[in-house]
């Protein structure tokens, strides 16, 4: 019985899962939107949201904890300089998962995971004929 066992294995051993989510969390912080499979996106949420909560209080201890979890100084800097202040007034729910169909090769359900308040590119207005 698998009572009280949280998280998905995703057909990987624990070190592979840890490395994969460390890399995916870095990509999500860097690009603010990534495309992945739906189960990976749902698990990534459990990794990224605590990092952003940690970044809301800028201290040396919190920066060291964030570095221990991401192993990338560029990501830590963006977390504490941009994302922490941006989400300071939000109590949680920093990410959004949008389903986007199925992968062509194996029909795996795909999804975009993005930060909720990410800066969108300005859309160019199409001139209408009058």
UniProtKB/Swiss-Prot annotation:
<comment type="subunit">
    <text>Part of the 50S ribosomal subunit. Contacts protein L32.</text>
</comment>
<dbReference type="InterPro" id="IPR036373">
    <property type="entry name" value="Ribosomal_bL17_sf"/>
</dbReference>
<dbReference type="GO" id="GO:0006412">
    <property type="term" value="P:translation"/>
</dbReference>
<dbReference type="Pfam" id="PF01196">
    <property type="entry name" value="Ribosomal_L17"/>
</dbReference>
<dbReference type="GO" id="GO:0003735">
    <property type="term" value="F:structural constituent of ribosome"/>
</dbReference>
<keyword id="KW-0689">Ribosomal protein</keyword>
<protein>
    <recommendedName>
        <fullName>Large ribosomal subunit protein bL17</fullName>
    </recommendedName>
</protein>
<dbReference type="InterPro" id="IPR047859">
    <property type="entry name" value="Ribosomal_bL17_CS"/>
</dbReference>
<dbReference type="GO" id="GO:0022625">
    <property type="term" value="C:cytosolic large ribosomal subunit"/>
</dbReference>
<comment type="similarity">
    <text>Belongs to the bacterial ribosomal protein bL17 family.</text>
</comment>
<dbReference type="InterPro" id="IPR000456">
    <property type="entry name" value="Ribosomal_bL17"/>
</dbReference>
<keyword id="KW-0687">Ribonucleoprotein</keyword>
């Amino acid at each position: 019985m698998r009572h009280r066992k949280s998280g998905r294995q995703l057909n990987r051993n624990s070190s592979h899962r840890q490395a994969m989510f460390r890399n995916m969390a870095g990509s999500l912080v860097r690009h603010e939107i990534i495309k992945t499979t739906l189960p990976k996106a749902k698990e990534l949420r459990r990794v990224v949201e605590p990092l952003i909560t940690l970044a809301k209080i800028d201290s040396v201890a919190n920066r060291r904890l964030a570095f221990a979890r991401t192993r990338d100084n560029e990501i830590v800097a963006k977390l504490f300089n941009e994302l922490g202040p941006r989400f300071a007034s939000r109590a949680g729910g920093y990410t959004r998962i949008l389903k986007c169909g199925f992968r062509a090769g194996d029909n795996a359900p795909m999804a975009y995971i993005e930060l909720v308040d990410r800066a969108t590119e300005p859309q160019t207005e199409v001139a209408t004929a009058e």
